[in-house]
Amino acid sequence: SNQPHFHKVKHYLDMAKANNQIIAGGEALDQTGYFVQPTLISFKNTDDPLFSEETFGPLVGVMPFETDEELIQLMNQSRFGLTASIWTNDLSKALRLIPKIEAGTLWVNMHTFLDPSVPFGGVKASGIGREFSDAFIEDYTELKSVMIRY
């Protein structure tokens, strides 16, 4: 991290503190560098700026929902779509939800696991590029077909 990004993350933390949304964490670490504690934030509605921004900090937001349809609607209304994670004891439910979630990378019962053999990237405003795997090469190349009779 760098100082401007640290201040951006601190700004989001200050907003969450002012709205009494911090469940755990929320403090800058007292050490050299630009670090903050992993932080759990409670969202009350989707108008919350923290709900709609990519912070790229150790901030995780949670919001209650009643139905699977409401969950999908909440998740997909974000203009971003880099990653998402589902935490559940019901694997069949997770498998039903996966195709409906607009995210380039989706984890079930884990988060931030990256495998170099699997493409990683986003959708929507999070970008369309991919890193890792053969998809990385294909994303940055253009195919050209050439046929020659000699």
Predicted segment positions?
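ALDH superfamily catalytic-core signature
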Residues: 1-45, 108
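Conserved C-terminal structural/oligomerization subdomain of aldehyde/semialdehyde dehydrogenase
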Residues: 28, 35-150
